[in-house]
Amino acid sequence: MTDESTPDAASAPLPAPVPPPDWTGDAPGARAEAGAFTLHTGLLGELVVPGGAARAAELEALAARAAVYATRARGEGTRRVYRSAWRAFEAWCRSLGREPLSGDPELVAMYAVRRADAGVAVSTLRVDLAAIRTAHLLAGVALDMRHPGLAMVVEGVTRGRGARPAKRAAPAVPDVLRLLLGACPPAGTALGARDRAMLLLGFGAALRRSELVALRLGDAEPVPGRGLRLVVRRSKTDQHGRGQDVAVWANPAEPGFCPLAALDAWLAHRTRAKDLDWTAPEAVRRERPLFCAVTKAGRATGEALSDKAVARLVKGAAERAGLDPALYSGHSLRAGLATAAGDLGANLADLMRQTRHRSTDVALGYLRPADLWRNNVTERVFGAGKRDI
């Protein structure tokens, strides 16, 4: 239920302990820093590792191979968050004249206190600690995350601040989504058609913003008499890319609020883009981006969008609709579908099948607001007064 600008890594527990790699040697491009070398990692970028020439023999080959495996082990969103968290810790250590990869749990505890004093959420602090621990693992430097001096600080921050997640993006429930659709550019334009299709597919398929912009032309298949079948090739809960099918029903009774109609309108513009070579095999065309950039002249370019484009779309439409754009984000579409389903009494299994949540706790968070009132005993106790509400 988190916004994908801050991936679910922000609410994940610390990684399970794994034995550190037995790396000895020096990495290519090592810094001319006494007793240290630079380790190139795929997950956290460059790490300056303490150690002398005795560690130089094997690291070059191992680091190159490890970078590949480390990059595959985490999604791009998680890698961005971890890199940012590690760089912040590294800069803080350097400002104190301390070695970031010292393996000193008390130094990490000091940083945790600093972050807590800065007001970061407990979930954010856990991401910071996960990144620090991962950096030490990659560098082969032991760090005891269960050291009492560190563990007690984290426990104290959690108890004092509470582990309740920070305020979420406002859900774009159907009434809000209609306002966003009405605030899009004219329907007959390529930009208007694209924006409407992105909003309705993002909502209907409960897509994360990275999933929405990753769709290819071959990933959306109309199903006669039903709607659309989307293939989400890779997601935060499917890092190995097995693929997940998502069904989205059409809404012919309300064409302006119909994902299938919106997609058809966009494809009329998309198929005229210059990147589609109609002499090429169909398999090649099917791999082109479903949603792409649109020029000021109103032509689809075929250039893929970044996930930030989804947030800009939602916030821009919210502002034009007279809503507070600060309350909405790219995650509002996914949250809107889940919230609406909860309001309509959807059960947990059906919701998780559509949203592809792996955590029941996260999915239940969308159902609880409605369940709070459903079959509540006070309805019977105070039922006589319902007519006056």
What does each of the following model-derived ranges do?
Residues 1-389:
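Extended, non-catalytic subsegments within catalytic or DNA/protein-binding/adaptor domains
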